[in-house]
């Protein structure tokens, strides 16, 4: 395990690891214990009581956070004809078809999200082995395989985040930056928590949300007592 820096060690002393904090207090403490010199990302981590090995306990989706994430997403759209024009008008950073597939095959990745119309998925599938490991493959569950390209682009630019349970039953999602006002981070947290609750698989047994923590890019995790706020 890598040795923690002096600033991290000092920051970690401010967090009681045995305590679950009120969400507002957890957010404030996360900002206070941030050790990065840049505008670090604030992330929420969920440990869930699901078995991701089972198909009926997979959790994946997307949600638009009310206050965005603080990051400008570069959107690549695979579309043709009128849908390509619609994507350009909606503010997509890149729009094309086989030309961009060729660029990606050559190692180009100057984008954050891909949106593709369903009729383009046959072509996009050719680079699935490249996109998949990077988490960039478009998927209907996250609204990135759609003919409603204007809506998809608008949501992504407004702060849409994707979430997916990993092999260990955890979900990590960015909810903003340390420069955000506390209230905005709390609102984003609440939206994300509500979304995860609604995504509970019917096959999941026992305690669903086992643990929730908030952390910054280079700061210690702060455990959250989810009972201290009202979920919508």
UniProtKB/Swiss-Prot annotation:
InterPro entries according to UniProt: Ribosom_uL1_bac-type, Ribosomal_uL1, Ribosomal_uL1-like, Ribosomal_uL1/biogenesis, Ribosomal_uL1_3-a/b-sand, Ribosomal_uL1_CS
Keyword match Membrane: no
Cited SUPFAM superfamilies: Ribosomal protein L1 (SSF56808)
GO molecular function term, any single one: tRNA binding
Domain of life: Bacteria
Keywords annotated in UniProt: Repressor, Ribonucleoprotein, Ribosomal protein, RNA-binding, rRNA-binding, Translation regulation, tRNA-binding
A matching Pfam family: Ribosomal_L1
Entry GO terms, CC: large ribosomal subunit
One GO term (biological process): translation
Entry-linked PROSITE patterns: RIBOSOMAL_L1 (PS01199)
PANTHER family per the UniProt record, alphabetical: 54S RIBOSOMAL PROTEIN L1, MITOCHONDRIAL, LARGE RIBOSOMAL SUBUNIT PROTEIN UL1M
Function: Binds directly to 23S rRNA. The L1 stalk is quite mobile in the ribosome, and is involved in E site tRNA release.
Similarity comment: family membership: Belongs to the universal ribosomal protein uL1 family.
Subunit structure: Part of the 50S ribosomal subunit.
NCBIfam families per UniProt: rplA_bact (TIGR01169)
Name of this chain's protein: Large ribosomal subunit protein uL1
Species, as recorded: Bacillus velezensis (strain DSM 23117 / BGSC 10A6 / LMG 26770 / FZB42) (Bacillus amyloliquefaciens subsp. plantarum)
Name of the gene encoding the protein in the UniProt record: rplA
């Amino acid at each position: 395990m890598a040795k923690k820096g002096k600033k991290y060690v000092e920051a970690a002393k401010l967090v009681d690891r045995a305590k679950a904090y009120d969400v507002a207090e957890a957010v404030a403490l996360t900002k206070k214990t941030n050790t990065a010199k840049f505008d670090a990302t604030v992330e929420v981590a969920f440990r869930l009581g699901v078995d991701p090995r089972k198909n009926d306990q997979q959790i994946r989706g997307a949600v638009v956070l009310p206050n965005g994430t603080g990051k400008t997403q570069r959107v690549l759209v695979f579309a043709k004809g009128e849908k390509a024009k619609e994507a350009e008008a909606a503010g997509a950073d890149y729009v094309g078809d086989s030309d961009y597939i060729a660029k990606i095959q050559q190692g180009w990745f100057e984008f954050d999200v891909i949106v593709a119309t369903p009729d383009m998925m046959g072509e996009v599938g050719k680079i699935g082995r490249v996109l998949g490991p990077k988490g960039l493959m478009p998927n209907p569950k996250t609204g990135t395989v759609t003919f409603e390209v204007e809506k998809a682009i608008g949501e992504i630019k407004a702060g849409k985040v994707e979430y997916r349970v990993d092999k260990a039953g955890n979900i990590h999602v960015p909810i903003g930056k340390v420069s955000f006002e506390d209230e905005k981070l709390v609102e984003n947290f609440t939206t994300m928590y509500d979304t995860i609750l609604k995504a509970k698989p019917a096959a999941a047994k026992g305690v669903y949300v086992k643990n929730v923590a908030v952390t910054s890019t280079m700061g210690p995790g702060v455990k959250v007592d989810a009972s201290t706020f009202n979920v919508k």
